Amino acid sequence: MELEDPTMADSTIKLTVKFGGKSIPLSVSPDCTVKDLKSQLQPITNVLPRGQKLIFKGKVLVETSTLKQSDVGSGAKLMLMASQGLHQGEGPILKEASIRPISRTVVSDKVDQRKPSVLVDKNRTDRWKATGVIALAQANLKEIPEEVWDCGSGVRVLDISENFIKEVPAKISSFGSMQKLFLQGNGLSDESIQWEGIASLKRLMLLSISHNNLTVLPSAMGSLTSLRQLDVTNNKLTSLPNELGLLTQLEILKANNNRITSLPESIGNCSFLMEVDLSANIISELPETFTKLRNLKTLELNNTGLKTLPSALFKMCLQLSTLGLHNTEITVEFLRQFEGYDDFDERRRTKHQKQLDFRVVGSGQFDEGADKSW
């Protein structure tokens, strides 16, 4: 029988971290620092390292100390306490992911599934055909009414948001003049949407599919070359497709409150982007191609795992005046080290002063954009 090498046994220790009603088993080196341990716990718990307090035998462990120096050995049980707000993604992972506290409104509270669907009469369909606008939000619909499909190619706007619709069929391609499509708040899954139909809408400028249950966006999205606004907030997306870079007319991208871990480098091709919101995701870095977004004015990255930014972001993105980095590992002091920061700071202060001059609500307090030293 082969004997276990005692040096190997000493090279790792097995410990348990208790957090949010669950026990997290870990095998780590005794020479691992408490700071390194916190970094390992970040993707497991979604709590940023600076928001973690590790407690062993009633004492808070010091970040710079090793586990050996802290008398943490095999079999040790640590407790993790999380500071409120200091998390990436939607929040700390508590117990099992299936009962994770997600603040996602899939269907509006105003919609009662027990109520009958809105009646589609001739007056309504005549109005649809005359205006090209089909408005059926919060109509308690289980499916898209047949009368909608009878409206022909003149339809410019279709709003079927906040219903209970479970299928968007391929025949939506018949609306060749469609410019705006609102599908948010229906609980749509990946299987619910026949993407080849939507992808054929070459004139589509606005697509809202927020507050659904999508886990992936298909490569067919790249066919929507007229798209200017894309809202995929509050889904379960883990990535954005590489074909995002084909949406060269895109001006607004809202993808906050998902589970996105990385971004395609092709996003740099979306040179008209003015507003990007990626808050409450699990992103740890931005591609350097972000510096190609010369029209970027607003970039929201709050509650992510970011530790740094593209080195030339402030130098190259000369329109940037709003930056949100609260509850990340990036501090104001860190930002000030970047080339071009002073010019960026001047732009955002000028914007803030204009808001004060025009008495914009909520503009009374100047926002530094990131947290101060911690």
Curated annotation (Swiss-Prot):
All residue ranges annotated as the Ubiquitin-like domain in the record: 13-87
Keyword Cytoplasm recorded: no
Pfam family, one: ubiquitin
LRR repeats (start-end): 128-151, 152-175, 177-200, 201-224, 225-248, 250-270, 272-293, 294-316, 318-340
Classification via InterPro entries: Leu-rich_rpt, Leu-rich_rpt_typical-subtyp, LRR_dom_sf, LRR_domain-containing, LRR_R13L4/SHOC2-like, Ubiquitin-like_dom, Ubiquitin-like_domsf
UniProt-recorded name of the protein: LRR repeats and ubiquitin-like domain-containing protein At2g30105
Keywords from the named record: Leucine-rich repeat, Repeat
Highest taxon of the lineage: Eukaryota
SMART domains associated with the record: LRR_BAC (SM00364), LRR_TYP (SM00369), UBQ (SM00213)
Species the sequence originates in: Arabidopsis thaliana (Mouse-ear cress)
